[in-house]
Amino acid sequence: MAKAKFERIKPHVNVGTIGHVDHGKTTLTAAISHVLAKTYGGEAKDFSQIDNAPEERERGITINTSHIEYDTPTRHYAHVDCPGHADYVKNMITGAAQMDGAILVVASTDGPMPQTREHILLSRQVGVPYIIVFMNKCDMVDDEELLELVEMEVRELLSEYDFPGDDLPVIQGSALKALEGQPEWEAKIIELANALDSYIPEPQRDIDKPFLLPIEDVFSISGRGTVVTGRVERGIVKVGDEVEIVGVRTTTKTTCTGVEMFRKLLDEGRAGENCGVLLRGTKRDDVERGQVLAKPGSINPHTTFESEVYVLSKEEGGRHTPFFKGYRPQFYFRTTDVTGTIELPEGVEMVMPGDNIKMVVTLICPIAMDEGLRFAIREGGRTVGAGVVAKIIA
């Protein structure tokens, strides 16, 4: 069987289900798959196929995730669903599945529960930009007022974490009844799909973002100057463009005088490509691995930031013992390790392997960063944690 060609006709959007255990995330995922396949065509996935999530490894961390795809008339969606709470924590922090928007599932029989809050907080910390609410199990609640109360609670909780609780879409439905093919509840799934289409804006493609290339290597070519190599993370660099060298040292400006790939000269290097960029008047010693080449003014170097961190368990090859304040590991950003110190939240004395925690990190030298940047925590080259920059402080 020939591999199906990936057709890039419609815009592609990444979403996922979040919410408390047993509130119906996987049932909703199956219901979306079925109802949209029935309505707009495509392949339907069963609950058991989704629930039986395969193990993946992302930066050495074991995560169980199910990936399904579905279409609406205007878009193609890739949807992730995780079986366990720990899988969500790891998934969101490592960025294994970056979400352009999330569907928060809340059982109307329960209302918001501890993991509801935790997933909203995580979404805020890791930069999930949009949340849509699906109130599930509404077929089991006869009281209109109770449904209104739950909706109000969910909206208030979202507002508490700086999401637009008053304005975001809330759909009241029943994933199970939709899956069983009851038309009034199937209609609610279509309503949810319409909300995804209209509420989550089309994501900006990497190629349309400002140019950034993490520097992996630096060469000096006699008679031509200095070449830096790496994979373009986003944007495009053209011959003649002004670029900045950011991070580790004082930011400097230079000009790209050539781009080459596989020993061929090109006019430009684009997102996703491995290339060498020739820099005008830059000495071999002015640049080093760990810096980035970027569009001037698009990214700044920082040393102190608040982060959300997942600490690997012993089984994942992490530490066997907790760490305390004063811990000084290496923080691996893009291509390089930088030593840093940590500050734990008030009242937290130690962090155990397998925990997730908010911490403030101060690096010994500045790194080019934006909120949402992922990093690994390492000790002697071994990964012991994964994190994401939640808020830049300095």
From Swiss-Prot:
Q: Region G5: start and end of each range? A: 174-176
Tell me where in this chain the tr-type G domain is found.
Answer: 10-204
Q: Which reaction does it catalyse?
A: GTP + H2O = GDP + phosphate + H(+)
EC numbers, comma separated: 3.6.5.3
According to the record, the segments passing through the membrane are none
Residues annotated as binding GTP are: 19-26, 81-85, 136-139
G4, as annotated region = 136-139
List all disulphide bridges recorded for this chain: none
Which InterPro entries did the record assign? Answer: EF-Tu_GTP-bd (IPR041709), EF-Tu_GTPase (IPR050055), EFTu-like_2 (IPR004161), EFTU_2 (IPR033720), G_TR_CS (IPR031157), P-loop_NTPase (IPR027417), Small_GTP-bd (IPR005225), T_Tr_GTP-bd_dom (IPR000795)
One Gene Ontology cellular component term attached to this UniProt record is: cytosol
GO MF entry, a single one: GTPase activity
The role this protein plays is: GTP hydrolase that promotes the GTP-dependent binding of aminoacyl-tRNA to the A-site of ribosomes during protein biosynthesis.
State whether it acts alone or in a complex, and with which partners, per the record.
Monomer.
**What is stated as this protein's family in its record?**
Belongs to the TRAFAC class translation factor GTPase superfamily. Classic translation factor GTPase family. EF-Tu/EF-1A subfamily.
Q: What is this protein called?
A: Elongation factor Tu 1
List the source organism. Answer: Shewanella baltica (strain OS195)
Q: Which gene encodes it?
A: tuf1
